[in-house]
């Protein structure tokens, strides 16, 4: 297929599907942008968050070969970005349509950099598939817990990893507020590729950083082994079932599946219901996720 036809086809789908949020010029200023948090990506500067390339580098993209692990932008469009308004477009747009949209974005909307400029745009690729994770042993988790303090991760993510550290008023590169990730809710991790309990996704983020945000790359000040320890510890914090197995994730919502039937399993007679959530009686009960929202007045 001619590259011009590919870009033209991608432009049609972009304006139909994406322009409402991203804007006609790809500057993240579409009519609905103010209603989204985080805001849509600003394409013009070529700053993309989720990559297998080093901090500050362009992501991997091949307009013709959507190879897993070698085509960051295609995977983002295919799987979406959990924890944001960016949905999965798999099943909505065909593979060819997704590649066409990305051809339009990378050639027409990224204005300050060129994906085709191989001299100026070097890429140091993290070959994640070739790396073998370190087992999440008790020793590894202990080292990871020590490293998140040593590397000052807790300043943003908090001592308990709930995204409530002392780094208030964090901003992204465009001046918009941004919140540190809550490590207990791994299904909201950007770039989890609908596989939130996969420790490799966490390792990738620590290795590459998140462009456009305060989250740096730790590739230069940690060893590969240290990053596996950190990733193991962060992964261990994500909520699980009482028996330690991962929660079942709904592929449509990227959130834990909701069981609407809550069976009674505790009869106290005349005793009082314990108010402390850490009480052993509550720890024996199966976990339930109940989504709540504010009331919208007329």
Which sequence ranges carry the predicted segments?
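His/Cys-centered metal/cofactor-coordination and adjacent catalytic loops
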Residues: 1-6, 20-46, 55-56, 61, ...
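Electrostatic cytochrome c docking/interface patches
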Residues: 1-14, 112-149, 241, 247-250, ...
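Sequence/structural segment immediately N-terminal to covalent heme-attachment motifs in c-type
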Residues: 4-23, 73, 122, 136-162, ...
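A generic secondary-structure signal for well-formed alpha-helical elements
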Residues: 17-25, 81, 105-113, 151-152, ...
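Sparse recognition of residues in long alpha-helices and their boundaries
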Residues: 26, 59, 117, 153, ...
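Short, non-ligating residues that shape and space the ligands of small metal-coordination modules
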Residues: 27-28, 95, 162-163, 224
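Extracytoplasmic electron-transfer domains, predominantly the class I c-type cytochrome c fold
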Residues: 34-108, 169-235, 261-290, 296
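Post-kinase regulatory C-tail/linker adjacent to protein kinase catalytic domains
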Residues: 122, 247-270
């Amino acid at each position: 297929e001619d590259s011009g036809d590919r870009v033209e086809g991608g432009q049609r789908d972009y304006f139909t599907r994406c322009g409402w949020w991203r804007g006609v010029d790809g500057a993240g200023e579409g009519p609905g942008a103010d209603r989204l948090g985080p805001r849509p990506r600003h394409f013009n500067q070529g700053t993309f968050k989720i990559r297998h390339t080093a901090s500050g580098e362009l992501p991997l993209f091949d307009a013709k070969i959507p190879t897993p692990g070698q085509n960051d932008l295609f995977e983002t469009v295919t799987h979406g970005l959990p924890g944001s308004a960016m949905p999965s477009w798999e099943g909505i747009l065909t593979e060819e349509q997704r590649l066409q949209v990305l051809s339009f974005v990378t050639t027409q909307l990224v204005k300050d950099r060129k994906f085709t400029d191989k001299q100026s745009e070097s890429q140091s690729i993290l070959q994640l598939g070739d790396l073998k994770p370190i087992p999440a042993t008790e020793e590894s988790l202990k080292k990871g817990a020590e490293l998140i303090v040593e590397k000052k991760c807790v300043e943003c993510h908090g001592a308990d990893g709930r995204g409530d550290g002392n780094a208030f008023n964090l901003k992204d590169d465009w001046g918009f507020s941004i919140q540190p990730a809550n490590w207990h809710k791994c299904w909201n991790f950007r770039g989890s590729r609908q596989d939130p309990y996969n420790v490799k996704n966490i390792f990738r983020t620590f290795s590459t950083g998140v462009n456009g945000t305060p989250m740096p790359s730790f590739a230069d000040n940690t060893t590969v082994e240290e990053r596996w320890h950190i990733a193991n510890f962060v992964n261990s914090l994500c909520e699980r079932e009482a028996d330690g197995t991962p929660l079942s994730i709904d592929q449509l919502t990227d959130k834990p599946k909701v069981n609407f039937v809550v069976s009674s399993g505790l009869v106290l007679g005349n005793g009082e219901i314990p108010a402390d959530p850490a009480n052993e009686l509550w720890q024996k009960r199966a976990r339930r996720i109940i989504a709540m929202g504010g009331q919208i007045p007329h």
